[in-house]
A protein has these predicted regions:
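C-terminal boundary/linker of central alpha/beta nucleotide-binding cores
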Residues: 1, 114, 118-206, 210-214, ...
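Residue signature of alpha-solenoid helical repeat architecture, marking inter-repeat boundaries
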Residues: 244, 264, 268, 304, ...
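Tandem amphipathic alpha-helical repeat scaffolds
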Residues: 230, 270-284, 307-323, 344-362, ...
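Short, well-ordered secondary-structure microsegments
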Residues: 129-135, 144-145, 185-187, 196, ...
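C-terminal non-catalytic interaction modules
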Residues: 489-555
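Loop-to-helix "switch" segment enriched in basic
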Residues: 1-4, 31, 91, 97-128, ...
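Amphipathic alpha-helical segments of tetratricopeptide repeats
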Residues: 254-255, 295-299, 331-342, 371-382, ...
Length: 555
């Protein structure tokens, strides 16, 4: 990969992880049809005071609105199409001649829905209108803290904005239930696309869009930093869940071309957010998306990339199965760390050099690099892989050549102060790989049942985190142990599921790690001697049909 060049056309940027149902900003919609709430100061259109939900359509009613049978032209912002029937242009895309629904933010929005949203906006008071407009900058769901930080200013001071939000919610917002375990039970909302379109138009007309988008991007920076801090402090599942839930807004902030300033001025913000979310790309199975976003942001920067940005670029190349492409980036990152005086980045780079050497099968070099990483890394690293990850990497490098040294590395990792977190705060990614090492060591001692139990545990932990590479490696190790135990069909099912996983997640250039290649070759050699071609193909297809999640529960 060459830093400074935009991503190739068609490069995937979607969810290539294993966690399902975490991407949409709204995981459950609670349709609002409750009682009308008190209004705001100001006059209605008929001159009377107050505002109630009965004065205009609720968000639910707007979403359920359908076009009439008359085929009337689409009404946008209260303005119909011209008398000659020309299609109205919305966000650069004309609607159909018969008033067909318009696509907004990837979803079809009917003319009646837009008209109903206009009527609801028109019946709001001044404060509700202003907040309606400002909330249109959010791409996904949001909570009260986000509203206060992004939208509170001027005519909407922080002391009053939450009361305005409560009055506006029944008219323009839908409550959502997307809280994760341990989070404070505070209401969260989502603005339907018809309402958002109306608010975005008014915000632009008012001339406030530029400052609101910038405030939204600064809020996204803080959000990404919070997720990174949670990951480092041991709240790894919470960090992943937070990043996934807020990904619609974070994704917008990671694209410098959507900023009101020049793309080069906002590229640093985009790079910072992308680097802060390193764990989401590296440890949670979204390497392709992270690689695309980082390349895009770096291509718009005017100055040299930071050491951490180059470190992440190299790590993403490695996770994408291109270790040779990671080597030159590692050299650039080292030079950048020396140039910028970023001593903390040196430990990150030593760890990544060890991971790259291990990927390529250079186990002795990998062990040396992991030892250097431990020497360079602080007691409590504030960014990147933990000391526990370095100890586990060292053990993984030694487990097939020096099992006693590998066991000693695992023991040292358990004694390390960084590794002595509570069960809730452990490094779950390193924990999953440690079970792979324990499975290898148990197999070395001839304890196949115990080895299979460790491999199965590693598989489940990697699936839980969403790591495709880790899950594939653990499944292939479990398949080898099943072959050794005489369970040929179960082993073939696991290998078939791994093939499907790698095909669906990685592109054609992906090359598995050398230790995975060796494990796979051992299993397939035995399976080909036990099953003919047709039987083996059928077993692979059956495993692909059932999938790793199902097989992990049965193993």
């Amino acid at each position: 990969m060459e830093i400074g060049k935009p991503a190739e056309t068609g490069e995937p940027a979607g969810n290539d992880g294993l966690e399902e149902s975490r991407e949409p900003p709204v995981t459950a919609v609670l349709w609002s049809d409750g009682e009308a709430r008190s209004g705001t100061e100001g006059l209605r259109r008929d001159g009377t005071e107050g505002l109630s939900a009965a004065d205009g359509p609720s968000a639910t009613e707007v979403l359920s609105a359908t076009e009439g049978s008359s085929g009337e032209p689409t009404v946008l912002w209260g303005q119909p199409t011209g008398p000659s029937g020309e299609p109205t242009v919305l966000w650069g895309e004309p609607t159909g001649p018969s008033g067909e629904p318009t696509v907004l933010w990837g979803e079809a929005v009917g003319a009646d829905q837009l008209a109903a949203a206009e009527r609801g906006y028109a019946r709001c008071g001044p404060a509700e209108r202003l907040l309606w407009e400002r909330l249109s900058v959010f791409e996904g769901a949001f909570g009260r803290d986000a509203v206060r930080e992004v939208c509170a200013s001027g005519a909407l001071p922080p002391a009053k904005i939450l009361s305005v939000l409560e009055r506006l919610a029944p008219l323009a917002l839908l409550p959502v239930d997307d809280l994760f375990d341990g989070e404070n039970d505070l209401p969260r909302y989502w603005m339907p696309h018809p309402m958002r379109a109306v608010g975005a138009r008014r915000l632009t007309d008012r001339g406030d869009r530029r400052i609101l988008v910038l405030r939204h991007r600064r809020w996204c920076v803080k959000l990404a930093r919070r997720a990174a801090d949670w990951w480092q402090s041991g709240r790894q599942l919470d960090a992943r869940d937070l990043a996934l839930r807020e990904l619609p807004d974070l994704a917008a902030a990671m694209d410098p071309t959507t900023a009101p300033l020049s793309a080069s001025d906002e590229a640093d913000t985009a790079v910072e957010i992308t680097v802060s979310l390193w764990f989401l790309w590296v440890a949670c199975g979204r390497a392709a998306e992270g690689r695309t976003r980082l390349r895009h942001a770096l291509s718009l920067r005017t100055g040299p990339p930071s050491a951490r940005a180059l470190w992440l670029a190299a790590f993403l190349e490695l996770e994408s199965g291109r270790p040779d492409a990671a080597d030159p980036l590692l050299a650039q990152a080292w030079a950048a760390a020396v140039r910028d005086g970023d001593d903390r980045a040196l430990g990150l780079l030593a760890h990544l050099r060890g991971a790259t050497a291990l990927y390529q099968g250079r186990t002795r070099a990998a062990a040396d690099e992991f030892r250097e990483a431990l020497a360079l890394m602080g007691e409590y690293p504030e960014f990147g892989p933990t000391r526990h990850a370095c100890w586990v990497g060292l053990a993984l490098s030694l487990c097939r050549t020096d099992p006693e040294a590998a066991q000693e590395a695992l023991d040292q990792g358990d004694l390390d102060r960084e590794s002595r977190w509570s069960l809730m705060g452990r490094d779950l990614c390193a924990d999953a790989w440690s079970h792979v090492v324990r499975a290898e060591l148990a197999a070395w001692d001839g304890e196949l049942d115990r080895a299979a139990a460790y491999a199965r545990r590693a598989l489940r932990k990697h699936l839980r985190m969403g790591s495709a590479a880790g899950a594939a490696g653990a499944a292939e190790l479990l398949a080898q142990l099943r072959v050794a135990a005489g369970e040929r069909d179960e082993a073939a099912h696991l290998l078939g599921a791994v093939d499907l996983l790698r095909t669906s997640v990685f592109d054609a250039s992906y090359r598995p790690a050398e230790y995975c290649v060796v494990t796979r070759a051992r299993s397939e050699t035995v399976l080909r001697s036990l099953l003919d071609g047709k039987e083996l193909r059928y077993a692979y297809e059956e495993g692909a049909r059932r999938g790793l999640f199902s097989l992990a529960g049965e193993a």
